[in-house]
Swiss-Prot record:
Lineage of the species this protein comes from: Bacteria, Pseudomonadati, Pseudomonadota, Gammaproteobacteria, Pasteurellales
Residue ranges that the UniProt entry lists as topological domain Periplasmic: 49-254
Functional description taken from the UniProt entry: Essential cell division protein. May link together the upstream cell division proteins, which are predominantly cytoplasmic, with the downstream cell division proteins, which are predominantly periplasmic. May control correct divisome assembly.
Gene label: ftsQ
Entry keyword annotation includes Membrane: yes
Protein name: Cell division protein FtsQ
């Protein structure tokens, strides 16, 4: 019987060591790569700017806007001087510039290749005039808006210190509903620095309610108002309800 024996090669060496300089070269290559990446990272903005050959020069105002026009956006952008290109221009300062418009609640700015901007704005919505030359939102934010752009008609006239704006709106809603339920229309209210309330009716009569609880005073007004005797050549200027009972009525010539 012939038995085949497998010969073990004697010339094969396992785990052959590589020259020491190989590790030095590898470490140097890794270090070189790290320095390259750091250089790119810290000079990324300048690299992108050099790649830009067309500064941003156009924009699109998207969405439905009640007060903001393309001219408003154009004027805001022109204040920033010449913009950079698609890669180099940061949109954050553009967004801040647009949000500086007093009636703009917020803005979203996106870059569009190769040299355009897409701009969307959110606007404050006025529910009333505030101190004659301003406006106020439902949640009490006071802002400015050119009155010629106002589309809503017959807004109420509210007034007071700005920090009281939300309280004034809440009180207005209550007073308006209260009087309307008695077929009396109001067009505005005001609170002064001392916390005293005044209500202006649509016929320009002023109700002086003073400080504190105004509900009982309104009830008294609703009761006595139809009983006031007004001479033919006179009209009611104000009704002072700052008393525990009754009221003082001021009249002027027609």
């Amino acid at each position: 019987m012939n038995i085949l024996k497998r010969k073990t090669p004697q010339n094969i060496r396992f785990g052959e060591q590589k020259p020491k300089y190989y590790f030095h070269i590898r470490a140097f290559a890794v270090l070189l790569g790290v320095f390259f990446l750091l250089g790119v990272y810290f000079n990324w903005q300048s690299i992108l700017e050099k790649m830009d050959d067309k500064p941003i020069s156009a924009f699109a105002l998207v969405g439905q806007n009640t007060f903001t026009t393309a001219d408003d956006i154009k004027e805001s952008l022109l204040k920033m001087g010449e913009l950079k290109g698609f890669w180099g221009q940061d949109v954050a300062p553009i967004q801040e510039q647009i949000e500086a418009l007093p009636w703009v609640k917020g803005a979203i700015v996106r870059k569009m290749w190769p040299n355009r901007l897409s701009i969307w704005v959110s606007e404050y919505q006025p529910v009333a005039f505030w101190n004659q030359n301003q406006f106020v939102t439902l949640d009490g934010i006071v802002f400015q808006l050119p009155s010629v752009r106002l589309t809503a008609k017959n807004l109420p006239y509210l007034g007071g210190p700005d920090y009281q704006s939300l309280k004034v709106i809440e009180t207005w809603n209550q007073i308006y509903i209260n009087l309307k339920s008695n077929n009396i229309m109001a067009k505005g209210i005001n609170i002064d620095d001392r916390g005293a309330w005044q209500v202006q009716l649509d016929n320009d009569i002023v109700l002086k309610l003073g400080r504190g609880d105004w509900k009982s005073k309104l009830e008294r007004f609703v009761t006595i108002y139809p009983q006031i005797d007004v001479p033919e050549n006179k009209k009611i200027d104000y009704i002072d309800l700052r008393y525990t009972a009754g009221a003082a009525v001021g009249m002027v010539d027609r």
